[in-house]
Regions:
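Basic, polyanion-binding surface patches
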Residues: 1-169
Length: 169
């Protein structure tokens, strides 16, 4: 279990998410990359502002044999068809299978690309267009390494066209 603030959408067909993992340098051991390469899967779990302190604590450098679930007060939820645990009760649970691993020479980080295999969310969070409303799930967004905020709907636009101005949705 680790706090990763750098997940991003990479494609829809197949559904892909990517993330950047920090390098294993200095005195801090980093087990996330090793675990991902070994198990070839991971879960992405949304959390509310009420759980931000617990989630932030997962970024502490725990020893390899220490469960961050136990140390940070989360309960693990295992699904029969998936090889990584989810956070029990998380309103947004995404399970990814490792598809590509790219070490980045520029700064020693690693880009991990996964294909979404499991997606669970409250049906009330699905918008009419099929997208998900993070604010309806009460989820937080992470800014940088240490700031947690709640998103709101903001502005949405139809796909841009060269022949017309932006069209609000």
């Amino acid at each position: 279990l680790a706090m990763v603030s750098s997940h991003f959408h990479l494609g829809s067909s197949p559904p892909l998410l990517a993330m950047i993992l920090r390098p294993s340098t200095g005195e801090s051991e980093r087990h996330t990359l090793h675990n991902l390469l070994e198990t070839r899967c991971w879960s992405l779990n949304g959390f509310s502002l009420d759980h931000a302190a617990q989630a932030h604590q997962t970024s502490a450098p725990y020893p390899k044999d220490q469960s961050e679930f136990d140390a940070c007060g989360f309960d693990a939820e295992w699904l029969d068809e998936f090889g990584a645990p989810f956070i029990k009760g998380s309103p947004l649970q995404i399970g990814c299978l490792l598809r590509e691993h790219h070490p980045l020479e520029i700064n020693g980080t690693h880009m991990i690309i996964g294909e979404v295999q499991h997606l669970q969310y409250p049906v009330t969070a699905q918008r009419d267009d099929g997208g998900l409303s993070l604010s309806d799930m009460g989820l937080v967004a992470v800014i940088g390494l240490d700031t947690y905020t709640q998103p709101h709907a903001g502005l949405r636009f139809a796909p841009a066209e060269t022949t017309s101005p932006p069209q609000p949705l």
